[in-house]
Swiss-Prot record:
Domain of life where this protein originates: Eukaryota
Role, per record: Probable neurotoxin.
Protein name (Swiss-Prot/TrEMBL): Conotoxin Cal6.22
UniProt source species: Californiconus californicus (California cone)
Pfam families: Conotoxin
Matching InterPro entries: Conotoxin
Domain statement: The cysteine framework is VI/VII (C-C-CC-C-C). The presence of a 'disulfide through disulfide knot' structurally defines this protein as a knottin.
Keywords: Disulfide bond, Knottin, Neurotoxin, Secreted, Signal, Toxin
Disulfide bonds: C35-C44, C37-C48, C43-C55
Distribution of this protein across tissues and organs: Expressed by the venom duct.
Family named by the database record: Belongs to the conotoxin O1 superfamily.
Signal peptide extent: 1-22
Gene Ontology cellular component annotations, sorted alphabetically: extracellular region
Subcellular location: Secreted
Length: 56
């Protein structure tokens, strides 16, 4: 029973780490697009948009 609990906890921790890593990859991709668009622009649907305009 103890071993089963340890295995379940280990799987949950690994899953959480994978989700966090995926989120960080998305954040890095967004920041790269931000830099490619310029300081006052953001990437919206792969189009550079002025930072104060809504996403088209």
């Amino acid at each position: 029973m103890k071993l089963t609990c340890v295995l379940i906890v280990a799987v949950l921790i690994l899953t959480a780490c994978q989700v966090i890593a995926a989120d960080e990859a998305d954040a890095n991709r967004l920041s790269t697009r931000w830099c490619a668009c310029g300081v006052n622009y953001y990437c919206c649907n792969e189009v550079c948009t002025w930072r104060e305009d809504p996403c088209p």
